[in-house]
Amino acid sequence: MKKIGLTGLLAMLFATPAFSSETYTFDPEYTIPAFEVGHLGFTTQRGRFDKTEGKVTLDFAAKKGNVEFTVFTKSLDMGSKAWTVHVSSEGLFNVEKFPTMGYKSDRLIFEGNKVVAAEGQFTLLGVTKPLKVTVNHFACGPNPINRKFMCTGDITATIKRSEYGMTKYIPTVSDDITINVPVESYRD
């Protein structure tokens, strides 16, 4: 058996590729959470939140990471002032009492080098519940315009708003809300 000296051991340690996690920050110009809800049994109404903050941490070698984001509910936009005021009110998003909602993953689910889902905790109206979200169109690479390295994906989930205490107008306004968060994030 051959002996390896301290110098040889150090050389092996430093020659081993080091894999570490990387953090990406949401681009607020392109990460605009939106939702859909059935209205009066006839139409699907859509709204969006114009202010959000978030980070994604990815370790591809270990197939680990997390995503965490905060949505500022006062940035709600329903497409018209009156409709926005109504949906912002007590009994619905109640933005004065609950100025934020958010998601924090407990774990990311990978297929190869692609994130396909996350399991975590969603908070709405001060109520936090487990929520598994789907991640579609996950990709990482240089932005073709500014050349900065980015990771992107579309986060989707459906919740029952009544489980978070938002019961006003059920069933006239559906209990199910579909959430869509197109995420564009740049490496820190």
Regions found by a protein language model. Name each.
Residues M1-L6:
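Bacterial N-terminal signal peptides that target proteins for export
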Residues A15-P17:
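N-terminal signal peptide c-region/cleavage motif recognized by signal peptidases
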Residues A11-M12:
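Repetitive helical segments and hydrophobic/amphipathic motifs
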